[in-house]
Amino acid sequence: MPELPEVETVLRTLEHQIQGRRILDVDVRYPKMIENDVEQFKQQLKNQTFNTFMRRGKYLLFGLDDCILMSHLRMEGRYYIQDPTEPTNRHMHVIFRLDNGKELRYMDTRKFGRMEILSLIHI
């Protein structure tokens, strides 16, 4: 399980790479990872922009235009920024297509990670 320094490093790295990027589409390949209704999750994230990056304990909180995307890496979760031409593997469970032509890919070999959309009033 990533410790707090690793979680903070993930957060700062993502902030540097995707702040200001808009989500064009979301591909959920393992629906059990999503705490919300999957279709609602995908629709609500579409056209949202990554604005702020926060951490509460080991939870990553991505402030979007009108909601918060909360993510917990659990045991082995990792985020990658990749070109869409790079092949995915069976451990890539959520893929965010971004407006710069790149993809933010969430990979978790053990499938323990979780994502949830929160309203802004939760923070």
What does each of the following model-derived ranges do?
Residues 1-121:
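Structured catalytic/nucleic-acid-binding cores of DNA maintenance enzymes
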